[in-house]
């Protein structure tokens, strides 16, 4: 399945719009990961712990989006938008939401 942030696909013609598709993935970040991330915050640098969680959540959300588009009979999703949110009282959860338009291209 073709998945793109652009509203069209070069060299392909959209022949049918199947509708808007979306998916959300929420992941919790546990105490051990928070501790490791806090050490990174103190000394500076990138937090591989949180980055890996974001990557995993984004990949899961994109896969779920493709599954939902396929259920509608689409073979592509255009206009993908990916949003990230921090949730929970202590910011202990991360949400990735993905939306796009399911289409049939040829």
UniProtKB/Swiss-Prot annotation:
Residue ranges of coiled coil: none
Signal peptide: none
Pfam families per record: YbjQ_1 (PF01906)
SS bonds (residue pairs): none
Transmembrane segments: none
InterPro entries: UPF0145_dom_sf, UPF0145_YbjQ-like
Family: Belongs to the UPF0145 family.
The protein's name in its UniProt record: UPF0145 protein Athe_0545
Source organism of this protein record: Caldicellulosiruptor bescii (strain ATCC BAA-1888 / DSM 6725 / KCTC 15123 / Z-1320) (Anaerocellum thermophilum)
């Amino acid at each position: 399945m073709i998945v793109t942030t652009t509203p069209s696909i070069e060299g392909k013609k959209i022949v049918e719009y199947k509708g808007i598709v979306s998916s959300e993935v929420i992941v919790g970040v546990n105490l051990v990961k928070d501790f490791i991330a806090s050490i990174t915050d103190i000394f500076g640098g990138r937090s591989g712990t949180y980055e890996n969680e974001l990557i995993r959540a984004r990949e899961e959300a994109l896969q779920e989006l493709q599954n939902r588009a396929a259920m509608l009979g689409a073979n592509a999703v255009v206009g993908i938008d990916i949003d990230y949110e921090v949730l929970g009282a202590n910011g202990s959860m991360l949400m990735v939401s993905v939306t796009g338009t399911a289409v049939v291209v040829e």
